[in-house]
Design a protein with these regions (language model features):
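Positively charged, phosphate-engaging catalytic surfaces used for nucleic-acid and nucleotide handling
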Residues: 1-111
């Protein structure tokens, strides 16, 4: 049973990796905190791991993106919608590292 779960975890994240990551993070929140609404805590943990492993600062990248969008006269509604996940999606290296972190977290918390 555990081997099947490991296979499923590593086979996931092919088509819509953002939705898959969100699903896994919510499942970890349920397992760890018994509350799916606390998935933001798990997401914060994943971001910290990503920043450490990739040697990047997501918040600074997000601020820089918002400044560039402002100078390109992008509407404020679109600027406000930008998230750290958008930063990760824009960089293939960060995307791969983040997916691997989520896989490791899924195995760690047995989700």
């Amino acid at each position: 049973k555990r081997l099947d779960r490991i296979k499923t975890t590593f086979a996931a994240f092919k088509f819509d990796w953002k939705a898959d990551c969100d699903h896994v993070l919510t499942a970890i929140a349920v397992k760890k905190y018994n509350n799916p609404e606390l998935s933001w805590k798990v997401q914060r943990e994943a971001y910290k791991l990503l920043e450490g492993r990739a040697g990047c600062r997501l918040q600074k990248r997000l601020e820089n993106l918002r400044i560039r969008m402002f100078w390109k006269r992008v509407p404020n509604e679109e600027i406000d919608k930008m998230t750290k996940m958008d930063i990760i999606a824009a960089d293939k290296r960060l995307t791969e590292i983040f997916i691997n972190i989520i896989r490791e977290m899924a195995l760690k918390y047995d989700v």
